[in-house]
Amino acid sequence: YGLVGSEMCIRDSYKVLFLQGGASLQFAMIPMNLMKNRVADYIVTGQWAKKAYQEAQIYGKANKIATSEDKTFSYIPDCSDLPVSPDADYVYICENNTIYGTKYKKLPNTKGKLLVSDVSSCFLSEPIDIEQYGILYGGVQKNIGPAGMVIAVVREDLITDEVLPGTPTMMKYKIHADNGSMYNTPNCYDIYMCGKVFKWLKAMGGLEVMKQRNEEKAAILYDFLDQSKLFK
């Protein structure tokens, strides 16, 4: 907890949870814990955001307030003046879409609404301002460790007993926060391996260094594509 928290500059007002079920389970866990008004807004920029949007429809009114599906998710829509629902409990995004090669360069203007973000494919790849998010989560298999676990960073005031009726105990953020992510037998191997990566990240110089290294690696590919006559 301490290593990932220090690398991400997570303040005491957030909890770091090590949860099972992968990132896909969060598609249900988020509305179960947050959809108090039974309304949430989704920006659909790829298949993962689309799956989250479809899952949320089970629990309440999920509004698709922006999408790039008209051009096969090949761009991020303008999110500067979104039609945010007045009674929305949160606005949901998938921040990086590896299938389509798109990433938010600027977080959407949620007009004061809680921002929930799936950062699975860019987790711990660059510094972030955690205070811009209510919940930020990522499946560890992309950047951090073996498949089978998700790390969720949840603002403390969102961790309550006020969840949707019928929410299973294992699907409540509070039960995991109150038990140090060990309400049931934790994914010990994943946590151990993630710990190794956290220590390596720190030894390498932290997230600023990771950002620089990732940009240098990406430049090799994109420079080649820019100079290629085949790819336009």
Q: Where are the model-predicted features located?
A:
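Single conserved hydrophobic/aromatic residue that forms the stacking wall/gate
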Residues: Y1-G5, C9-I10
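Conserved beta-loop-alpha segment that forms the PLP phosphate-binding cup at the N-terminus of a helix
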Residues: Y14-D41, A49-A52
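General beta-strand structural signal in soluble alpha/beta enzymes
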Residues: V16-Q20, Y42, K64-T67, I93, ...
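Active-site phosphate-binding strand-loop segment of PLP-dependent enzymes
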Residues: A56, S68-F123
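Conserved active-site segment immediately N-terminal to the catalytic lysine
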Residues: V116, I130-Q141, V150
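Active-site C-terminal subdomain of aminotransferase-like
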Residues: V140-Y222
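Conserved PLP-binding catalytic core of the aspartate aminotransferase-like
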Residues: F231-K232
